[in-house]
UniProtKB/Swiss-Prot annotation:
UniProt organism field: Saccharomyces cerevisiae (strain ATCC 204508 / S288c)
A Pfam family this chain is assigned to: Inositol_P
Residues reported in the UniProt entry to bind substrate: E75, I96, D97, G98, T99, D231
Gene assigned in the entry: INM2
GO terms of molecular function: inositol monophosphate 1-phosphatase activity; metal ion binding
Binding site for Mg(2+) 2: D94, D97, D231
Protein name: Inositol monophosphatase 2
InterPro entries: IMPase, Inositol_monoP_metal-BS, Inositol_monophosphatase-like, Inositol_monophosphatase_CS
Regulation of catalytic or functional activity: Inhibited by Li(+) and Na(+).
Length: 292
């Protein structure tokens, strides 16, 4: 199948219908549930419920039935060192991004459905049923929030005047200048008066939601290390279609693969040179190279 703009739009609409008709109602029916049973994926703060697995199964069944030649990568069925992103059309799915939020009843979790071709995001739909926020895009067809085209207002993009999304993440081992120490020192560099002295930072607790809020212009940027392709694939497409860019979280990484695991999302609403200057002013505050 040739992935023309029309085919990409069809996939986008398939994602939207699946999320609105099946996944959203299922997630909402469990909202506020007291989850007494969940797994610790990596440690005590990286959580997964049986609902994550059920949702991924429903998504895979529906998408592979309609597009049997497309590959499928899901967070709950991913096998480290075995599952690879190839050049072929590949669904990249996170059934619940922000599971910890979901378990606590904090309304910032979503389902993230992405399609990649040649290793690049070409369709993305992110649905937060708790807030009824549906972000969607496909390559060449624009980006939308609840069917209204996202148009980021023109305004200067300056690091010191920016609002940035940052997250604590699940890797929190201190010492030996590992990733956790580097991230905490980077946050200090960005926030302190002697550093970048940015306006502030926000944490949605969901990579997909953070990227969508950058895409919509509510946030100026999002810096993260440690997330996975399924956390960023859908949002990345939405970001680019809204005029934003995705670069690496480490210094000088202008062109990164989907599974780089270290990202800097920068909003649109400005010229590309402003985005370039923003990245170049941001990177010196990163306190060491993140390694995953």
């Amino acid at each position: 199948m040739v992935l023309t703009r029309q085919v990409l739009e069809e996939v986008e609409n398939t994602f939207i219908e699946l999320l609105r008709s099946k996944i959203g109602p299922l997630v909402k029916s469990h909202a506020g549930t007291n989850f007494c049973s969940y797994d610790d994926k990596a440690n005590g703060v990286d959580l997964v419920t049986a609902l994550d697995k059920q949702i991924e199964s429903i998504i895979k069944e529906n998408l592979t039935a309609k597009y049997p030649s497309f590959k499928f990568i899901g967070e709950e069925t991913y096998v480290k060192g075995v599952t690879k992103i190839t050049n072929g059309p590949t669904f990249i799915v996170d059934p619940i991004d922000g599971t910890t939020n979901f378990i606590h009843g904090y309304p910032y979790s979503c389902t993230s459905l992405g399609l990649a071709e040649m290793g690049k995001p070409v369709v993305g739909v992110v649905f937060n049923p708790h807030l009824n926020q549906l972000f969607h895009a496909s390559k060449g067809n624009g980006a939308f929030l609840n069917d209204q085209e996202i148009k980021v207002s023109k305004r200067p993009l300056i690091l010191q005047k920016s609002l940035i999304a940052l997250e604590g993440g699940s890797e929190r081992t201190e010492g030996s200048q590992g990733n956790f120490d580097k991230k905490m020192n980077t946050y200090k560099n960005l926030l302190s008066e002697s550093g970048a002295f940015v306006h502030g930072f926000r944490s949605a607790g969901s990579a997909a939601m953070n990227i969508c809020y950058v895409a919509s212009g509510m946030l100026d940027a999002y810096w993260e290390g440690g997330c996975w392709a399924w956390d960023v694939c859908a949002g990345w497409c939405i970001l680019e279609e809204a005029g934003g860019i995705m670069v690496g979280g480490n210094c000088g990484e202008w062109n990164i693969p989907l599974d780089r695991r270290c990202y800097l999302a920068i909003r649109g609403g400005c010229e590309s040179m402003e985005q370039k200057r923003f990245a170049e002013s941001f990177w010196p505050h990163v306190a060491g190279e993140l390694e995953y």
